[in-house]
């Protein structure tokens, strides 16, 4: 695992990963004795990575999904095109519903529809590909979304937005968020609007990671919990504010 992790860390930087502020903890040694089974009977090792992709441990996943979709919806609306999440009034004979859409045309007379997903960079099915090419899991997720919503895409401007737990973006979603950010700058006059959008989304992703990893740990006493939170949060703020050790 350590070799795969090192390879992944070396290649994970692509596009706007700097906007997410480096989020992987540097003090996991404090939890080297953690080696227990979770409620889904999977082994949790000191890296705590199982929680990032556990299908039963979804507290952080659901919270992250809602928060990021809300951020995207607000940014689109601020940019000048009203939008909403959980679209109503769609022809849903196939039971498929994207995460959000615009109420007015976004481009060439078409409504924008988007669907967000976050894939675990370190999942067994992703880590090898991600160690060779940054964002490979996100790119694959975008392709899956396109196939899923192919019917809606015939009459709408559908864009999949895929992100990874280490911060890499799928190319289509990345370009859409850049465009949203640019339109927001024009509409609001705030030159940092695009950077703020990426940073806010990335922090929401990080918080989801923390919740999911923490949910797989055995009960901690107060001192252990403070140490755990410090090991994650300190690197975030040190890197974000340029305080990392030289």
Please place each PLM-identified region on the residue numbering.
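Non-catalytic C-terminal interaction segments of nucleic acid-processing enzymes
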Residues: 1-43, 59-60, 74, 78, ...
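Short Cys/His-based metal-binding microdomains
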Residues: 37-68
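Short, conserved catalytic/metal-binding micro-motifs enriched in Asp/Glu and His
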Residues: 47-54, 99, 114, 160
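Two-metal-ion RNase H-like nuclease active-site motif
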Residues: 86-88, 99
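Conserved beta-strand/loop block within the catalytic cores
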Residues: 95-104
């Amino acid at each position: 695992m350590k070799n795969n992790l090192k390879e992944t860390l070396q290649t994970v930087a692509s596009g706007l990963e700097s906007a997410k502020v480096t989020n992987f903890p540097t003090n996991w040694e404090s939890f080297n004795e953690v080696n227990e089974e979770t409620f889904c009977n999977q082994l949790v090792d000191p890296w705590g990575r199982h929680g990032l992709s556990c299908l039963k441990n979804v507290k952080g996943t659901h919270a992250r999904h809602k928060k990021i979709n809300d951020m995207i919806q607000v940014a689109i609306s601020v940019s000048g095109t009203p939008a909403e999440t959980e679209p109503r009034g769609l022809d849903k004979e196939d039971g498929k519903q994207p995460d959000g859409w615009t109420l007015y045309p976004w481009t060439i007379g078409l409504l924008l529809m988007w669907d967000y997903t976050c894939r675990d960079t370190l999942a067994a099915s992703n880590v090898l590909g991600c160690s060779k090419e940054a964002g490979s899991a996100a790119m694959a997720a975008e392709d899956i979304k396109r196939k899923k919503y192919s019917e809606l895409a015939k009459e709408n401007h559908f864009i999949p937005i895929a992100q990874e737990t280490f911060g890499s973006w799928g190319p289509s979603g990345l370009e859409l968020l850049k465009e949203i950010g640019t339109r927001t700058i024009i509409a609001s006059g705030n030159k940092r609007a695009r950077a703020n959008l990426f940073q806010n989304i990335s922090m929401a992703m990080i918080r989801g990671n923390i919740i999911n990893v923490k949910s797989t740990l055995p009960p901690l006493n107060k001192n252990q919990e403070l140490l755990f939170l410090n090991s994650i949060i300190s690197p975030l703020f040190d890197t974000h504010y340029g305080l990392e050790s030289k």
